[in-house]
C-alpha cells in the first residue's frame, strides 16, 4: 500500500486565473477519499493532475513517499477507471484485462495468474471469453476495474465510473466498490458529482467548489457540521434549509424578514447586528403546536415519497422544507406548527459563508 500527498497544488490554464486554488491533501495508506462537487468545480482536473494527464502549475504530488510531480503517468504507480469503459471491442474480457500487462512485457504465466485472480474477485470467471458487446453495463464496468486491478497499482483513481449506469446498477456497483476496497485496501481517490456515492463510499469526503476544498472530513462530519454555507447546501437530500437574517441587537435572537425571530442563546452577543444565515435540515425540524410556542408554516405543496413526505412552505420570501413521517400528509394551505431544535441549528457568516 502507499499514501498520496498533494502539497499546495494549483492549476491555471492562462497563468492568471487559478482553477485549482492552493490545495493540500494527505491520503493515508489504504484510505478511500471521495472528491465531490458540482460540474466545473475542479475535481476531475485535480484527479488528472494526480494521474499526470495534466501538468501541475505549482506545488507537489507525492505517491508512496516519492515525488511524482513531473513523472510520466506510466511511472507513477497509478491505475485509472474512467466514466467510459474504453474496452477494446474486438478483444475478449480476458484479453482486455491482460493487455496492459502484455505490452509491459510481463510473462504469460504471470499475466494469467493476475487476470484469473482479478476475475475471481470481480465475479467475472464465467465471462472471460466474451466480447464487450455481450456484456451488460455493470459487467463492462467490472472489466474496466479488473483491467486496473491486475496492474496492482499503488493508487486507484476513479473518474465518475458509475455515471453511465442506471440507478439500480449504480446502487449495486457502489456495494461492489465497497467490498472491493475492503478486500484490496488500495489507496483510492474517487471523483463524483453524486453526493450519495460520496457519502456511501468515502472514508473521508473532500467537498469542492470553484477550485477550493471547502471541507475535508468524514461523511458524518460534513453532514453534521458543515464548514460553510456551500457545504450545507450541497450535502444532504433535500438540501439544508438556509434562512437569511440578522442577529438581534441583544445578540440572543435570530431575526428574519417579516418580524419572525428565533431564540439562539447568549453565545452570539459578539455578533449583534451582523447578517447571518441560519441552517437547519428538513429532517431535524419537529412538529409542535401553537401552545408550545411553535412557529407557523403554511404548506404550499406536499411531496409524497413513500417512506416519508416533504412539506414545502415559505417564511416571507424564504423557502422552508420539512421532512414528515409517512402518515403525516398535511393538505396544501394548512398550517404546520414547527419546533427548530437549537442544537440542530447552524449559523453561517452572511458575508464569507463560513460556519460561525
UniProtKB/Swiss-Prot annotation:
Give a Pfam family name: ABC_tran
EC numbers, comma separated = 7.6.2.10
Q: Which residues form the ABC transporter domain?
A: 4-235
UniProt binding sites for ATP: 37-44
Which keywords does UniProt give here? ATP-binding, Cell inner membrane, Cell membrane, Membrane, Nucleotide-binding, Sugar transport, Translocase, Transport
Location comes to: Cell inner membrane
Gene Ontology MF terms in the entry: ABC-type glycerol-3-phosphate transporter activity; ATP binding; ATP hydrolysis activity
UniProt key word Cell membrane: yes
Example of a GO cellular component annotation carried by this entry: ATP-binding cassette (ABC) transporter complex, substrate-binding subunit-containing
The protein's topology relative to the membrane is: Peripheral membrane protein
* GO biological process assignments: carbohydrate transport; glycerophosphodiester transmembrane transport
Reactions catalysed according to its record:
sn-glycerol 3-phosphate(out) + ATP + H2O = sn-glycerol 3-phosphate(in) + ADP + phosphate + H(+)
Top-rank lineage group of the source organism: Bacteria
Give the principal location in a single coarse category. membrane
Q: Give the family, as the similarity comment puts it.
A: Belongs to the ABC transporter superfamily. sn-glycerol-3-phosphate importer (TC 3.A.1.1.3) family.
Assembly behavior: The complex is composed of two ATP-binding proteins (UgpC), two transmembrane proteins (UgpA and UgpE) and a solute-binding protein (UgpB).
Annotated function = Part of the ABC transporter complex UgpBAEC involved in sn-glycerol-3-phosphate (G3P) import. Responsible for energy coupling to the transport system.
Tell me what this protein is called: sn-glycerol-3-phosphate import ATP-binding protein UgpC
Q: Which gene encodes it?
A: ugpC
Amino acid at each position: 500500500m502507499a499514501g498520496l500527498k498533494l502539497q499546495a497544488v494549483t492549476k491555471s490554464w492562462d497563468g492568471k486565473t487559478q482553477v485549482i486554488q492552493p490545495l493540500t491533501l494527505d491520503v493515508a495508506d489504504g484510505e478511500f477519499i471521495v472528491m465531490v462537487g458540482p460540474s466545473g468545480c475542479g475535481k476531475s482536473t485535480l484527479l488528472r493532475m494526480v494521474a499526470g494527464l495534466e501538468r501541475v502549475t505549482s506545488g507537489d504530488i507525492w505517491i508512496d513517499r516519492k515525488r511524482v510531480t513531473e513523472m510520466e503517468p506510466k511511472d507513477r504507480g497509478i491505475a485509472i477507471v474512467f466514466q467510459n469503459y474504453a474496452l477494446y471491442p474486438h478483444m475478449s474480457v480476458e484479453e482486455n484485462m491482460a493487455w496492459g500487462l502484455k505490452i509491459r512485457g510481463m510473462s504469460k504465466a504471470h499475466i494469467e495468474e493476475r487476470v484469473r485472480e482479478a476475475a475471481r474477485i470481480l465475479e467475472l470467471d464465467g465471462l472471460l471469453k466474451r466480447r464487450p458487446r455481450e456484456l451488460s453495463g455493470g459487467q463492462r464496468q467490472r472489466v474496466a476495474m479488473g483491467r486496473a486491478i491486475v496492474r496492482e497499482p499503488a493508487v486507484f483513481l476513479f473518474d465518475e465510473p458509475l455515471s453511465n449506469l442506471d440507478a439500480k446498477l449504480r446502487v449495486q456497483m457502489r456495494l461492489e466498490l465497497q467490498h472491493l476496497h475492503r478486500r484490496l485496501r488500495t489507496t483510492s481517490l474517487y471523483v463524483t458529482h453524486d453526493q450519495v456515492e460520496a457519502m456511501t463510499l468515502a472514508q473521508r469526503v473532500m467537498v469542492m467548489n470553484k477550485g477550493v476544498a471547502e471541507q475535508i472530513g468524514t461523511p458524518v462530519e460534513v453532514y453534521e457540521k458543515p464548514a460553510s454555507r456551500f457545504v450545507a447546501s450541497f450535502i444532504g437530500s433535500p438540501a439544508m434549509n438556509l434562512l437569511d437574517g440578522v442577529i438581534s441587537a441583544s445578540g440572543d435572537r435570530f431575526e428574519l424578514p417579516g418580524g419572525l425571530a428565533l431564540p439562539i442563546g447568549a453565545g452570539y452577543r459578539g455578533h449583534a447586528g451582523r447578517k447571518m444565515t441560519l441552517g437547519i435540515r428538513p429532517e431535524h425540524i419537529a412538529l409542535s403546536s401553537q401552545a408550545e410556542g411553535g412557529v407557523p408554516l403554511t404548506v404550499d405543496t406536499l411531496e409524497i415519497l413513500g417512506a416519508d413526505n416533504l412539506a414545502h412552505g415559505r417564511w416571507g420570501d424564504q423557502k422552508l422544507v420539512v421532512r414528515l413521517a409517512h402518515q403525516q400528509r398535511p393538505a396544501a394551505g394548512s398550517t404546520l406548527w414547527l419546533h427548530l431544535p437549537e442544537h440542530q441549528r447552524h449559523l453561517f457568516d452572511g458575508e464569507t459563508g463560513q460556519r460561525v
